């Protein structure tokens, strides 16, 4: 019991940090089930698309179609959808003779506009008859953007390795717990308080510890403590940018990749320089992901500064 209480304290401390003024997250203790999660998503979707819906709520059949569209076969498929069109992620609903193009997320509205940032914990991932050998699970902390869980966090106390969190996530994926709206998760975070890592979402058979990355600050110093990690990576706009700007689709292997800290810092430095009209270059050693860095740097600059000559 003492260990369980300790981990609940760890969880609360993280939520408190995420919801402090500068982080922009709102804690939603009222969302614990799949039904509550879908209801919350529906409310946000309707609020952000009032004009297109003509203030008429989505019907049961319309929303059933949306729920089906958001229930992906893989995290990679979710990633393809989340790329969107010119920074906007849509769902499409047929209403009479008209097709409504509803904006789920606008990645041009990071840290403002129509973006809604919420934190949930102890989500109940229930047992399903289709999941042989499975049982009910409770997720630690999940971060929702416009009602969709995009980042999931598993926490351990100091008596455990962060790898226990990694293995736990792998087990949950194998059991099919990341289904429905949770199939949209793009990034996982695991921590034992003093050692914190992140990695891209993948099938359980594709999760490999070699893709786990720690965070480094701009001075190349490791950020290990989970609260320090939350301050550096999980506040807004950083968390939204991790899934919207620094996640890459590997279309050959059909999997997600998330940039490593040095790649992200390089892209951010180039972005800041471009805003000031300065030039420069990114230097990477052999095998450090130059192609991926250059691709994401170019894509992000085009999104930030539309006037750049393509």
Language model segments and positions:
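ATP-dependent helicase/translocase motor core
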Residues: 2-309
């Amino acid at each position: 019991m003492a260990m369980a209480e300790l981990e609940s304290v760890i969880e609360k401390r993280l939520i408190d940090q995420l919801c402090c003024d500068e982080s922009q997250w709102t804690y939603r203790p009222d969302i614990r089930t799949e039904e509550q999660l879908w209801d919350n998503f529906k409310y946000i979707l309707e609020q952000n698309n009032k004009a297109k819906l003509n203030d008429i709520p989505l019907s049961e059949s319309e929303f059933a179609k949306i729920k089906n569209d958001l229930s992906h076969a893989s995290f990679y498929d979710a990633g393809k959808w989340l790329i969107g069109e010119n920074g906007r992620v849509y769902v499409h609903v047929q209403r009479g003779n008209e097709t409504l193009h509803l904006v789920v997320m606008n990645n041009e509205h990071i840290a403002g506009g129509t973006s809604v940032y919420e934190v949930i914990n102890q989500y109940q991932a229930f047992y399903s008859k289709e999941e042989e050998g499975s049982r009910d699970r409770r997720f630690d902390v999940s971060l929702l953007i416009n009602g969709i869980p995009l980042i999931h966090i598993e926490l351990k106390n100091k008596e455990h390795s962060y790898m226990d969190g990694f293995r736990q996530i792998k087990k949950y994926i194998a059991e099919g717990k990341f289904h429905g709206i949770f199939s949209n998760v793009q990034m996982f975070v695991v921590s034992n308080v003093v050692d914190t890592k992140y990695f891209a979402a993948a099938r359980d058979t594709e999760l490999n510890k070699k893709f786990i990355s720690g965070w480094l600050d701009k001075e190349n110093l490791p950020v290990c403590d989970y609260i320090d990690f939350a301050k550096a990576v999980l506040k807004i706009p950083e968390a939204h940018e991790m899934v919207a700007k620094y996640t890459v689709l590997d279309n050959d292997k059909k999997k997600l990749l998330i940039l490593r800290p040095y790649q992200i810092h390089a892209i951010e430095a180039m972005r800041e320089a471009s805003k000031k009209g300065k030039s420069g270059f990114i230097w990477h050693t052999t095998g450090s992901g130059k192609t991926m860095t250059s691709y994401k740097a170019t894509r992000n600059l085009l999104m930030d500064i539309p006037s750049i000559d393509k």
